[in-house]
Amino acid sequence: MRNSFPPSDGGRSTTDRRQQSFPSSSTNRYNSRSAQSSPPLNHCTTWNQQHSQYHNTNFPPNYRRDRAPSSGFSPPVTRARPNFIVQLLHPAAANSDTKLSKKQEIESIALLCEIPEESVHVPQFGCIAASFSFRQWVDARSAVVALWDYRLQGRHDFVPELIPNVVVPSDMDELKDRLRDLFSSHVLSLMENGQGVKKVRMEIDDKSRQVASFSSKRGLKFEVFEKKKALEAERDLVVNRLDEFNNAMKSILRYLIGQDGYEFDVDDEDDEDVAVFSLEGAYDWRRIHYLILRECRRLEDGLPIYAYRRQILKKIHCEQIMVLIGETGSGKSTQLVQFLADSGVAASESIVCTQPRKIAAMTLTDRVREESSGCYEENTVSCTPTFSSTEEISSKVVYMTDNCLLQHYMKDRSLSGISCVIIDEAHERSLNTDLLLALLRKLLSRRIDLRLVIMSATADANQLSQYLFDCGILHVNGRNFPVEIVYSPSGTEENSVVGRIASYAGDVVKMAVEIHKTEKEGTILAFLTSQAEVEWACERFVAPSAIALPLHGKLSFEEQFMVFQNYPGRRKVIFATNIAETSLTIPGVKYVIDSGMVKESKYEPRTGMSILKVCQVSQSSARQRAGRAGRTEPGRCYRLYSKTDFDSMNLNQEPEIRRVHLGVALLRMLALGIDNIAAFEFVDAPVPEAIAMAIQNLVQLGAVVEKNGVLELTQEGHCLVKLGLEPKLGKLILGCFRHRMGKEGIVLAAVMANASSIFCRVGNFDDKMKADRLKVQFCNDNGDLFTLLSVYKEWASLPRDRRNKWCWENSLNAKSMRRCEDTVKELEICIERELTLVSPSYWVWNPNEGTKHDKYLKMVILASLAENVAMYTGYDQLGYEVALTSQQVQLHPSCSLLAFGQKPSWVVFGELLSIVDQYLVCVTAFDFEALYMLDPPPPFDASQMDERRLRVKKVVGCSSTVLKRFCGKSNRSLLSIVSRARSLCSDERIGIQVDVDQNEIRLYASPLDMEKVSALVNDALECEKKWMRNECLEKYLFHGRGQIPIALFGSGAQIKHLEVDQRFLTVDVHYYGDDVVDDRELLTFLEKKIDGCICSIYKFAANKQDCDEKEKWGRITFLTPESAMKATEIQKFDFKGSVLKVFPSLSTGGGIFKMPYFSSVTAKIRWPRKESSGRGCLKCPSGDIHSILGDITSLEIGTNYVHIQRDQLSNDSILISGLGDLSEAEVLDVLEFRTQRRDLNFFIFRKKYSVQCPSPTACEEELHKRIFARMSAKNPEPNCVQVQVFEPKEDNYFMRALIKFDGRLHLEAAKALQELNGEVLPGCLPWQKIKCEQLFQSSIICSASIYNTVKRQLNVLLARFERQKGGECCLEPTHNGAYRVKITAYATRPVAEMRRELEELLRGKPINHPGFTPRVVQHLMSRDGINLMRKIQQETETYILLDRHNLTVRICGTSEKIAKAEQELVQSLMDYHESKQLEIHLRGPEIRPDLMKEVVKRFGPELQGIKEKVHGVDLKLNTRYHVIQVHGSKEMRQEVQKMVNELAREKSALGEKPDEIELECPICLSEVDDGYSLEGCSHLFCKACLLEQFEASMRNFDAFPILCSHIDCGAPIVVADMRALLSQEKLDELISASLSAFVTSSDGKLRFCSTPDCPSIYRVAGPQESGEPFICGACHSETCTRCHLEYHPLITCERYKKFKENPDLSLKDWAKGKDVKECPICKSTIEKTDGCNHLQCRCGKHICWTCLDVFTQAEPCYAHLRTIHGGIGLVELGVPEHPVAQPVHRL
């Protein structure tokens, strides 16, 4: 560092010390002058000698330099005139004449230079900061040199200037030499010891050490090698920077030393052809110093392009054209123009640098002016933002837009006065850029002195080089660090959508969360496509210690600046659009997430439409995004797509000339005389269709006409060329001028160009809703352009100091409004200069009044956009049909027309926006008649379009149940009938809408097709009405097992059928086909085929969890068992090319008696085909062979003693011999028992050749025969068993077979397989025993959402299953992203248990809250309900399942989280339901369309006017649904409703609201209270009256059937009504009453069980039938079905009745022919069958059977027999001697 202190009094000056190294000639020059005076820089000595000669002087402002200044503070005195005056000028003297002088700073400088105080004058104002007066030259010279010395040291920034009143040429030469030496010494010191040079050298040393550390390592990995290469490149870049700095300093030294023959050796290392500075003429010390300062800044800033300066200049000097490729941030845009201006290369005239945007040109101009301040003359750098034919290019460096340069070219086709053109940002390949390149390409051959430089960050350099005559390419390497690329493609489908946000946005948020959790610190930059996605991502990203920031073009400067700020302790996560690709460089970015998508405006030549759509980025853009991560340190880029996707991307962004309308370009080319557009040499030629469509558009606009095959500009076309706007905007302006609405036309063009950014809709959900409310006040019913016009008109009427605040208050973008104002001013100037028209300053259009000007404006807009016409289709779901393409598109949600709730028949739009759907934006309504006033006429047939418009027809009189069934589950039936209608009429526009709330169907079809569609819908409705009338409930009469009668309870509360004979009524329908089946067609087909009546339908879930049974369509119940039997007797039905099969259903009864469903019972069986060798091998687990050997020594298997020995050839095998004909299973059972292990593997060595076996076909038949015979089920179907025997290969040891059973027969299957195990088939040898391996399988599928919610619980459950014996579970993903759990077991019980637990987990817990009525649950199907569920799911980490058909809700998750979610859902939904009851609707068929706007105008966007009048009420306006949400009491709502109704009646054409018709209940004949409409006939009743009718019917059996009481109706009340009106308890009572009535009216054919209160019913046997017993399943009593008494086998009913009447008669009848007598004592009847004549009665008496004598003991009786009767009556029979009499029981 140079010493910053002044030299001491007696020492040599700094300058003198430096002179020692200079040539002697210089020293002699100084010495000759020094002989007369002191050393020049010895300030102290000089002033000590000379100060006495001066008086105390003070210089006032505007003093005369030719005389001594007079003091304004002392009396005028005569002073000596100073010979020399040294002035200090402010650094920005030319720019400031009012800057306050820094008096203290001046005094300190004077003191530092030892200038006497009396010589100092400090003016208060002006460009002169101070002046010093001197009498002696030596003092003046020393002061000037000292002041420059201190300025070079950085002690002050004033510019010293000498004003000599006495001019001596030698004095000036001496001062020049002194300053030259001073500056030269300063330059040398900077080169040797400058602070910046030291830092750079340290940086070089540090990089070299890092490179050396890699060089010492061997075998570098690829990543490390790449890092080494990056460090070497960075080191070389720094070295080149230092070389450039030294070269620049040497250039300055050469200039300083080379003047006047003064020579100095600067040790040039090489002889450069091109000098970096073109310095000539007299020394400008101020400029030289600024050049030095700028070089020092360049060295410290380290812009990459600085290291390539000489290389660039040499290339431009030698070559006419150059392509310069440098990454964003390399300094191309600011430095190259300065390099050229400094060096003089290609700078003989002006240097023009073009930018694609005006703001960029202005910003760069300011930046270059700031950097080069003092280096050039004033106005060297300028900006020409707009073209003017009267202005010339005069500045040395000019920044302008490419559009502006094109205009200059059209004025001067030689570009006179321009020596170099720089096309910047060429990678954007804008339309103007490509046109400029094409025109300059031709110009270069005419002007060989013109230089062209193409600058770009990512452009295809080779393509540009080839186009521009194979010019040279120079790559400027940036300061990037290596970036690791990670390809992480998403698992979601490419086009899937969540809400209105595409799936890739969710993937970006997930990746950001993952990176934040797992990676080290560093900013995350994520690329999305739009403002909506960016804000959505910021809301969804929730992570600790992180802050989510948005970055998109609509943010204010302050909001954008937030991404550059630091947030201590928090990681920045920036979600940005492609604005962050090249426009901005954000420091600290280490991780980049590339979604791979970008939103681009594309012009489709086929349709002539400009569409803004989301598409894939190019490879160059992907690399540019990845490069964001390597600016300050090595980074990582996560690409959410695969490497294959990257390779398939376009190499570069498609040029704008292929993406936009070519109207502007063609106009300019025609103006230039280029008539053969197709042959013009573009860089990338547009497709011929685009050129043709552009010409057609220009013809339509009246700008071009075709004469003799040649295109010519019309007068209007020439005007459009001069305006330089898009033709449609120019046409808009010219059309308005014709109607004397010039102001409106100019403003319309300005706001239309900025339409997307004027309304500011940013922030969270509430902020956006507020912005929507604020917008309503500006909405105009004529469309968006009128709305924007009214906004600008009101904004322009405000004082300038109020405009920003007004924009903030109304959610408007103040920046966009100012941009519109600038555009308006530019257009006004352009119109006045180029078209010589006077732009009016007044408005003639009034947004608050409908006048003829509205019509004029709409006509002008239509003429300007005649090709962008759309017609309302008549169907909201289709929206509008674009006239030229027949596309169906919707109005954008931000469209002003939606604020009025109307869809105009005809609209004209600005462009098509393609996001998730396609939308019309910038829409204006017009009348149909205006199309006939267009000249030329529109390019489509408007009349034909109007004829094709869809008409609407309403179908009323249908109940809500019929409508719901008409729609089907998930609207499947409705979609099917729509599809049939479209196919029938060959019109894809046909639509059918069902409004259940209004009980109506709306049909949308053309007039020709309406009859067909109406007939189709009516047929379907009649089917549904018929099935609703026939609908029955299956009711089991009691709970239990055995024979349970089933009642079919149907309409009219009647029993339609009572099944007591155990015949089946319900069947399962299986559909085997790939196509989606129409349920209604299928049911109608079955009814016709079977000629039966269907009374109940149950459709299995479309995504049911038993995926193995996906062929099961559903279950239907027939009204008679004969129909059901007939359906099952047919093996299969041919239904539209697919197969239908019908099986009896075993799971009926409304859910209580359902048997569990299993997938097919699969058994694998095998039997050996090769005989055993008697030896086998036991494979042991590793390390356990010794313990196993110990367990199985002395082993006996069956009757065989086996020999055990260890296998010498294997460490884990044991050989077992002596097995005989034992099978593997028999041996393994014994081994497992002895070792108590289940991990053994045993196999038998079998002989080489197989024995003769029956054929596989014979085996199949035999197996089927045996298994089917063992099925114990009643009447099993023959196809319930399938057997497949596989053909064996030569080396197979076993025959194998697969057996599948019907899943409903799992118990029978298990029994049959158990009996089959161990059997031998005919034709097989005894050792060929069958081994059965039963495999019971089932599977459950859950969606990815449920799986992600219960993943941890599911894994725990599966792990527990793994530890259990008897079953296995495995989890696997399916092709559609769901997950399947497969259950496999060897018995049904483990399957059932596992499945039950899995179902409980995956199906979730149902919400059984009393407040969860169907009306409340229906809210979950709305958008608000869906958002509520998503919010709760996210907060509680649960998943909510909504059954839309049954209106039930289940929640999946842990028990604690389910409880929390249930509480929040119930509370939130109940609150929402309550709020819905307090809503005021602002649109409807009888409401004025502008009511919402009137409400906002009258009461304010926040409805403050209503709140002030209704105290305590909380209101919120929902502009999308036109609803005021009232939070308060019902009385408050009524007050608000009253105020709104009063406003609605004002100016309303509808007048007063008609009186409502009071409806009368047909039962009570009073006004309906709490009404209910019957489903069958839609008649309205009081609900209480209907309930009373049901109660009366239960008490009176004659009241059945229950019918509608409306006059002339008499329709039976259907089951759906009874379900809706009655509780389950009351419904059971009604069914019981109906059963009683049914039995009573059966004419004795049916009877209740004789047991009191027993609900069972049996059929009475006919006269010719025998009395079969009825065994009651409820009370287990046995009843004769003929006589209804106790069951009496072997006795006729008539005789049994007689026995019942006279029991003795039955005894006598029984005793006939039998040895029967009575006990003399107890009179019991005794029958003797065998034994002796001694009997003992139950009363204890011993009786002689011969004479009936009675004894008290046995011995006397025996004695009596022997004595009286000659023996006991037995001959040695070996029977007991004392038989006991068995009394006969009377019946």
From Swiss-Prot:
Annotated localization: Plastid, Chloroplast
| Region (Disordered) location | 1-75
Polar residues compositional bias, start-end: 20-60
Zinc fingers (RING-type), as residue ranges, are 1561-1609, 1719-1747
Motif DEAH box in this chain: where?
A: 424-427
Source domain of life is Eukaryota
Transit peptide start-stop: 1-33
- Protein residues bound to Zn(2+) 4: 1680, 1683, 1688, 1693
**Residues annotated for Zn(2+) 3 binding in this entry:** 1649, 1654, 1672, 1675
For the region TRIAD supradomain, give the residue spans. 1557-1764
Q: Which family does it belong to?
A: Belongs to the DEAD box helicase family. DEAH subfamily.
PANTHER family for this protein: ATP-DEPENDENT RNA HELICASE, ATP-DEPENDENT RNA HELICASE DEAH11, CHLOROPLASTIC-RELATED
**Protein name per its UniProtKB record:** ATP-dependent RNA helicase DEAH11, chloroplastic
